[in-house]
Amino acid sequence: MAESRMNLMTAKEAARYLRVSMFTLSKIERVGGLVPYRTPGGHRRYSLRMLNRYLNNSRR
């Protein structure tokens, strides 16, 4: 994982950043729109770069 831990967001933070619900965030993941990093405990983490890339691609 090359991203700095300071640039990683939790699922809740990522959903808020994207202005979607947690359910919608999960749907985006299921269809391959986002592939989050996983912590050793299995928690999802999203980089700001990943989220911005998704936003830019979804606007096209």
Predicted region positions:
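Major-groove DNA-recognition helix of helix-turn-helix-type DNA-binding domains
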Residues: 18-45
